Amino acid sequence: MKKLLPCTALVMCAGMACAQAEERNDWHFNIGAMYEIENVEGYGEDMDGLAEPSVYFNAANGPWRIALAYYQEGPVDYSAGKRGTWFDRPELEVHYQFLENDDFSFGLTGGFRNYGYHYVDEPGKDTANMQRWKIAPDWDVKLTDDLRFNGWLSMYKFANDLNTTGYADTRVETETGLQYTFNETVALRVNYYLERGFNMDDSRNNGEFSTQEIRAYLPLTLGNHSVTPYTRIGLDRWSNWDWQDDIEREGHDFNRVGLFYGYDFQNGLSVSLEYAFEWQDHDEGDSDKFHYAGVGVNYSF
């Protein structure tokens, strides 16, 4: 599953590594690993919840950054030592920073991701192999000494085995907003988030969905410690993932609160922990309670 804040300190370390590499115009690297879990209370199909291990490697030189990652996701029954339908996801991204200064920054990312699905106890399904292409500009604009406007916009194209995986062939995703820095310790970010899956092919209607949220973060920096309480407030959400049985859209209302903690050892090593709870209401069926937790480690050199 996709999460915008998981292990933010690790992402920050990667960004710092890129900035340092640009200043020195030499190579800088970082490697890391994460283990994430997701669970909907009382939902038997996800067994004990989704397990999501991942590893990554980034290399930066001047305005260039190359990122490699490998991720898995699937339901796990820990007591029985088995898992349900799962997929693995190798990924390559290349980012180029066209402009970077205190007043304005602009970069562009291109990426390729492969989804390898392995179906368990699903009649008529064995494996599926789907690809995703990505292009994503990002920006940061200084409005005042304390106020900045920043964000990113990703455009995706999916191909192969879409009728099996249930994905739409096109997707856009963006998160953008304002950040106000009160002092070296406290800042506030308020963003608008949109993710929309749709089909450019008029003959298809599978996997279409829309999510709109307000996302607010309160980053606190206390020496080597970073703490970020955050929330996601649902504005509009619908899906038709079960298009084979019911082509009508189903409405949802999801609202989340979470807390991220990171620690930088000041020797290249950093670690992070995160937990989030989400209330999920649906037009069809009962409401759900969702839990997310993640732990990560990163080393920069």
UniProtKB/Swiss-Prot annotation:
Bilayer-crossing regions: 27-35, 47-57, 64-72, 89-98, 104-112, 129-136, 149-158, 172-182, 186-195, 201-209, 213-222, 230-238, 240-248, 254-265, 269-279, 289-300
Molecular functions (GO terms): maltose transporting porin activity; oligosaccharide transporting porin activity; porin activity
This protein's UniProt keywords: Cell outer membrane, Ion transport, Membrane, Porin, Signal, Transmembrane, Transmembrane beta strand, Transport
GO biological process, one term: monoatomic ion transport
Keyword set includes Protease: no
InterPro entries given in the database record: Bact_OM_Channel_sf (IPR053713), Outer_membrane_porin_G (IPR018981)
Protein's membrane topology: Multi-pass membrane protein
Gene Ontology CC annotations of this record: cell outer membrane; pore complex
Signal peptide: 1-21
Pfam families, per the entry: Porin_OmpG
Source taxon at top rank: Bacteria
Function: Forms channels functionally larger than those of classical porins.
Quaternary structure note: Monomer.
Name of the protein: Outer membrane porin G
Record organism: Escherichia coli (strain K12)
Taxonomic lineage of the native organism: Bacteria, Pseudomonadati, Pseudomonadota, Gammaproteobacteria, Enterobacterales
Gene responsible for this protein: ompG
